[in-house]
């Protein structure tokens, strides 16, 4: 164990999905991640900052001011960008969506903040999913060009029966307990611990 390692602060930005929307247990995928990322040293603190219906342009404009209030010069600062499909309804072009994400990532890395990107999830509207897949691929390319971790939460779930059943039956089109669990599983198993550069065993750092 490296006794000189700084404590970790993780800020998560996104829309309602990061506030456990739709999950009857009230955990959401973020709460499940938190439960699997507990340690005494280094200490890991999470700060979820959901903004309803936020799009990539708004995230790019507001994230730094909000995140900076949670970061410290004495901590290892991390940023999770939970992307969504709101750019489509907002009429934001693919090139602008890519630029918005690029600006977030470049600003973060220039300030010593390490980003981790999660793609948009599928919609219960099959027609919209064609556009979401295209948008997600664009976001993935932006991350890949910077060699930054990107979790594809779209392709593994777009044809998942349990996930889609929850979306169809949900009042506001949000995933339920199973859906949030699936998103958390994808995040945890796509380089989450590698990104943190720590190993966890039964909630404790080893």
Regions found by a protein language model. Name each.
Residues 15-16, 87, 106, 152, ...:
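Acidic side chains
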Residues 32-40, 66, 103, 107, ...:
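Alpha-helical structural signal in soluble globular domains
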Residues 38-41, 73-78, 106-110, 143-147, ...:
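Short, surface-exposed, polar/charged, turn-prone segments marking secondary-structure boundaries
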Residues 44-46, 115-116, 148:
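Hydrophobic anchor at the start of a short beta-strand
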Residues 51, 85, 120, 153-155:
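Active-site loop/turn elements of alpha/beta-hydrolase fold enzymes
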Residues 82-86, 104-137:
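Active-site segments of SGNH/GDSL-like serine hydrolases
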Residues 122-206:
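Catalytic His-Asp segment of secreted/periplasmic serine-dependent ester chemistry enzymes
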């Amino acid at each position: 164990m490296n006794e000189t390692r700084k404590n970790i602060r993780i800020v998560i930005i996104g829309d309602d999905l990061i506030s456990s929307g739709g999950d009857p247990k009230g955990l959401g995928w973020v709460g499940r991640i938190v439960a699997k990322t507990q340690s005494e040293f280094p200490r890991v603190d999470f700060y979820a900052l959901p903004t309803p219906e936020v799009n990539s342009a708004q995230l790019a404009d507001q994230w730094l001011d909000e995140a900076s209030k949670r970061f410290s010069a004495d901590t290892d600062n991390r940023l999770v960008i939970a992307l969504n499909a709101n750019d489509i309804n907002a009429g934001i072009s693919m090139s602008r969506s890519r630029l918005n994400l690029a600006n977030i990532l470049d600003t973060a890395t220039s300030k010593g903040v390490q980003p981790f990107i999660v793609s948009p999830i599928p919609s219960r509207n099959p027609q919209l999913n064609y556009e979401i897949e295209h948008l997600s691929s664009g976001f993935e390319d932006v991350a890949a060009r910077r060699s930054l971790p990107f979790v594809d939460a779209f392709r593994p779930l777009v044809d998942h029966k349990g996930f889609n059943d929850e979306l169809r039956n949900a009042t506001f089109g949000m995933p339920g307990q199973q859906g949030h669990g699936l998103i958390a599983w994808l995040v945890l198993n796509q380089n989450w611990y590698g990104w943190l550069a720590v190993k966890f065993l039964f909630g404790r750092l080893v």
